UniProtKB/Swiss-Prot annotation:
Pathway: Amino-acid biosynthesis; L-histidine biosynthesis; L-histidine from 5-phospho-alpha-D-ribose 1-diphosphate: step 7/9. Homodimer. Transmembrane segments: none annotated. This is Histidinol-phosphate aminotransferase. Its cofactor is pyridoxal 5'-phosphate. It comes from Xanthomonas euvesicatoria pv. vesicatoria (strain 85-10). It catalyses: L-histidinol phosphate + 2-oxoglutarate = 3-(imidazol-4-yl)-2-oxopropyl phosphate + L-glutamate.
Length: 363
């Protein structure tokens, strides 16, 4: 697909949209800045005056560090307020209200549907298949429904939240090939660091109808900093930047994120990822042996989806032990399930001990 044709997927009324030209987007140079109506003085709470001025809309140092981390060019990357902002930009930028659909694969992260609803974009569900080896995406069905429903965006969460399953790259490539010129395939890799499946970013050179979502909220432990990344065709990124709010990345958040991507910090992160993966295997095996546990799904994320004979009792037992997990019982097809994030060894042991006590009490 050519660069011009990928822009054909964008709403026609936005293709020439100039967006808001902020004071920080100009190329002017000087040492006295009086062009943005900022205060000339620092706030007493900000003695270093680090937050007196508006931030760079796309901090160059952070953008370069993220591009190096994810294996793309800086111009293929947009930094936003978590992946949520990137999802919202994609839906608003590509979907004509009431016409262009958004395809999702439930059970899955709810923000895709929320953003579609806010844009009045029809929502198309192609449920994950619940098989003996866990949930899986039905790529032929996804492609068929996307083509039949005029879907502009196809969200593939890999690893999927809350299902935990990942999609092989050859399957993602099948979807990309079948939907060229028809839809943008968005691979959400929020939990990619914990997965055995390589990132789909490596397919960008061959498929312009691919976008990848990444975040520093999970493996990099910066959830409160709200640093999300959209990786896609450079021309699409440039257009979406014009649709983005003027100053999406606060200076303190950008500074912390850049420090988190230094070599020493990344080494610590890699060790913690390895610990999570090890705990994932241990806790999976331990949960599967507990009476009252109906099924523990395989996971490529930092969490486990677990079905219980009595999910209410399990949920309450964990609360009584001071452990808060994600109740999935209101989610269609997960009426007996809880999602348990993997914590430290000690935290995971509290989960197992609380559930063990519950089962002993029942027995």
């Amino acid at each position: 697909m050519s660069a011009s044709s990928i822009l054909d997927l964008v709403r026609e009324d936005l293709r020439a949209f100039a967006g808001y030209s902020s004071a920080r987007t100009s190329a002017l140079q000087g040492d006295v800045w009086l062009n943005a109506n900022e205060s000339a003085w620092a706030n007493p709470a900000d003695p270093d005056a680090s937050t007196r001025r508006y931030p760079d809309p796309q901090p160059k140092g952070l953008r370069s560090a993220l591009a190096a981390l994810y294996g793309c060019a800086p111009e293929q990357l947009l930094i936003g307020r978590g992946s949520d902002e990137a999802i919202d930009l994609l839906v608003r930028g590509l979907c004509v209200p009431g016409r262009d659909a958004v395809l999702v694969t439930p059970p899955v992260f709810g923000m895709y549907a929320v953003c579609a609803r806010l844009q009045n974009a029809p929502l198309v569900d192609v449920p994950l298949v619940d098989g003996p080896d866990g949930f899986r995406a039905d790529i032929p069905a996804i492609v068929a429904r996307a083509l039949a429903s005029n879907a502009k965006l196809v969200f593939l969460c890999s690893p999927s939240n809350p299902a935990g399953s990942a999609i092989a790259l050859d399957q993602i490539e099948q979807a990309l090939q079948a939907l060229q010129g028809k839809a943008l395939v968005v691979v959400d890799e929020a939990y990619g660091e914990f997965s055995d499946v390589p990132s789909a970013v490596g397919l960008l050179g061959r498929y312009d109808n691919l976008a990848v979502l990444r975040t520093l909220s999970k493996a990099h432990a910066l959830a409160a900093a709200r640093i999300g990344t959209l990786i896609a065709n450079a021309e699409l990124i440039a257009l979406l930047r014009r649709c983005q709010a003027p100053y999406p990345v606060p200076t303190p958040c950008a500074a912390m994120a850049e420090q988190a991507l230094s070599a020493p910090a990344l080494e610590v992160t890699r060790r913690r990822i390895a610990e999570v993966r090890s705990e994932r295997e241990r806790v999976h095996e331990a949960l599967a042996q507990l009476a009252g546990v109906r099924q523990v799904y395989p996971s490529q994320g930092n969490f486990l989806l677990v079905r219980f004979d009595d999910a209410e009792a399990a949920f309450q037992a964990l609360l009584d032990a001071g452990v808060v997990v994600r109740d999935q019982r209101a989610v269609p097809r997960l009426a007996d399930a809880l999602r348990i994030t993997l914590g430290t060894h000690e935290q995971n042991q509290r989960v197992l001990s609380a559930l063990q006590r519950t089962q002993e009490a029942v027995a």
